Amino acid sequence: LSIRRQRQMCIRDRRRREIHKGDCGRILIAAGSKGMAGAAVLSARAAFRAGSGLVQVAIPVELFPIVQTGIPEATCLERDFSKIDLSRYDAAAIGPGFGKGEESVKFVKAIIENFMGPLVIDADGLNIVAEQCLFEVLRARKKGSTVITPHMGEAKRLLGENLSNRKEIIERLIKKTGAVTVLKGHETLVATEESQTYINTTGNPGMATAGSGDVLTGVITSLLGQRKPDGSRISAKEAALCGVYIHGRAGNLAAEAIGEYGLTAGDLAYYTAIAIKKILE
């Protein structure tokens, strides 16, 4: 099925006049490491552009100045699991630019085991799952509460096989992880254990740029943390479908404005808000 048909699944109503930032979602993004602080900035920026009310970024203390300068709307937390109250968050993401050191491994495992809300796992978060064989821990999470967003390289590492058929890959990833799966690439695929596979029709070659996946992680996590006008939460499947569509639509709007060759992940984050505005028109 084409994701285009699902584009207004979770962005279909204007916000209530009496809404407050708590209604718009409090999310945690665990991202960034030495030399990769930009991943945290891009994910957090995209989350705000997608509508989050509050975004907190868990990063190494030495990165605080970079991240707080790059995204002043976000607040920074020391990446120490014992100091983070997970009950405060409506949704969380882990992995962009995260690193794979010993402390990173412990943090990823702790988040997967202890965070009860919807969780997006990307990049190094997925690499750690693959290298540490955390599949049982992942499958033990509440059904429908996890979204994974691998590109083909990460997908092959998760499966431990060099496959090329994307339909087969996404089906095997779902079986192995139990997660809503977003297989990134040209015509990104989204699927769950219960659903058909959806194909995204938005996007362009200009989005093949560093940080594009970090932006997608921020968008999906943001949607997971928000409420619909009736007060209900957006499901992981809805957030993945809508997030992928918005991400591609933002890329198309950016390409229309500046062309594909010079498009950056920062442009994708900026145009995320405009993409949502277009959906609401």
Region annotations inferred by a language model:
Residues R5-Q8, R12-L119, N127-V147, M152, ...:
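Small-residue (G/A/S/T)-rich helix-start motifs and N-terminal tracts that mark the onset
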